[in-house]
Curated annotation (Swiss-Prot):
Ribonucleoprotein found in the keyword field: yes
PROSITE patterns: RIBOSOMAL_S16 (PS00732)
Descriptive protein name: Small ribosomal subunit protein bS16c
GO BP terms in the entry: mitochondrial translation
PANTHER family registered for this protein in UniProt: 30S RIBOSOMAL PROTEIN S16 (PTHR12919), SMALL RIBOSOMAL SUBUNIT PROTEIN BS16M (PTHR12919:SF20)
Pfam families linked to this entry: Ribosomal_S16
GO cellular component: chloroplast; mitochondrion; small ribosomal subunit
Subcellular localization(s) per the UniProt record: Plastid, Chloroplast
HAMAP family associated with the record: Ribosomal_bS16
Gene Ontology terms, MF aspect: structural constituent of ribosome
Species assigned in the record: Anthoceros angustus (Hornwort)
N-terminal signal peptide: none
Length: 84
């Protein structure tokens, strides 16, 4: 199963995350199948590849709780419901 989850980058105390599609059994820093976004918690910046995320979710990818919240705030799930 493919999951959408956060992959940690950055220095100590200055975390940034990439939102990646990765096999559910891979470790957090494992090889990603696809990079679909960026999330900087400190500056509250988010950059998403919306088309790639929508396609992955339609194919069955499951977001983690944190990624789900990020996608919900960006309105991804409304787009999926609007265009089935």
């Amino acid at each position: 199963m493919v999951k959408l989850r956060l992959k940690r980058y950055g220095r100590k105390q200055q975390n940034t995350y990439r939102i990646v599609a990765i096999d559910a059994q891979s470790r957090r820093e494992g090889r990603a199948l696809e990079e679909v976004g960026f999330y900087n918690l400190r500056k509250d910046q988010t950059q998403l590849d919306i088309l790639a995320i929508v396609n992955l979710i339609r194919e069955g990818a499951q977001p983690t709780e944190t990624v789900y919240d990020i996608l919900r705030k960006a309105g991804i799930f409304e787009r999926i419901k609007a265009n089935p």
